[in-house]
UniProtKB/Swiss-Prot annotation:
Name of the molecule in the record: Translationally-controlled tumor protein homolog
Single GO MF descriptor: calcium ion binding
Record keyword Calcium present: yes
Location of this chain's protein in the cell: Cytoplasm
Heme in keyword set: no
Function: Involved in calcium binding and microtubule stabilization.
Domain of life: Eukaryota
Any single Pfam family the record assigns to this protein: TCTP
InterPro entries hit by this protein: Mss4-like_sf (IPR011057), Mss4/transl-control_tumour (IPR011323), TCTP (IPR034737), Translation_control_tumour_CS (IPR018103), Translational_control_tumour_p (IPR018105)
Family according to the record: Belongs to the TCTP family.
Transmembrane segment boundaries: none
Length: 172
């Protein structure tokens, strides 16, 4: 299994257990699912509660959301009230990524710059439909992932988007 981490903050963003698609060599689109699960739900294999005592069932907290967000402890951020503030963040973040690329993969700099401009125009056109998420550290200097719901055969499916060049792969 591969874990994809933010190269700036080290936060875990997602893993390869989800359906992934690379768009224009710069954006990973990761398909999520809406889930509901009990917090702290522990199931012990082979455990058989005593038949003599009535089960006093406890109220357990339930969490609902997109599996990628819950499993990797992503945090929704409301830092971008408008397209202008998000564009300012992107310009700053892209400079950081170009600096990292020049260090580690100079051959990728031109691919990144060319394709990123195209992809960002498309994303900015859908700005109002997007939700934004940081890693667990909630550090906006790192990657801010995007999520939108897309219609597939009448069903709304959450799709998260991550910048390929802002991630490092870690094998488990």
């Amino acid at each position: 299994m591969k874990i994809y981490k933010d190269i700036i903050t080290g936060d875990e963003m997602f893993s390869d257990t989800y359906k992934m698609k690379l768009v224009d060599e710069v954006i990973y689109e990761v398909t999520g699912r809406l889930v509901t699960r009990a917090q702290g739900d522990i199931q012990i294999e082979g455990f058989n509660p005593s038949a003599e005592e009535a089960d006093e069932g406890t109220d357990s907290a339930v969490e609902s959301g997109v599996d990628i967000v819950l499993n990797h402890r992503l945090v929704e951020t409301y830092a971008f009230g408008d397209k202008k503030s998000y564009t300012l963040y992107l310009k700053d973040y892209m400079k950081k990524l170009v600096a990292k690329l020049e260090e580690k993969a100079p051959d990728q700099v031109e691919v990144f710059k060319t394709n990123m401009n195209k992809v960002m125009k498309d994303i900015l056109g859908r700005f109002k439909e997007l939700q934004f998420f940081t890693g667990e550290s909630m550090d906006c200097d790192g990657m801010v992932a995007m999520m939108e719901y897309r219609d597939f055969d009448g069903t709304q499916i959450p799709i998260m988007m991550f910048f390929k060049h802002g991630l490092e792969e870690e094998k488990f």
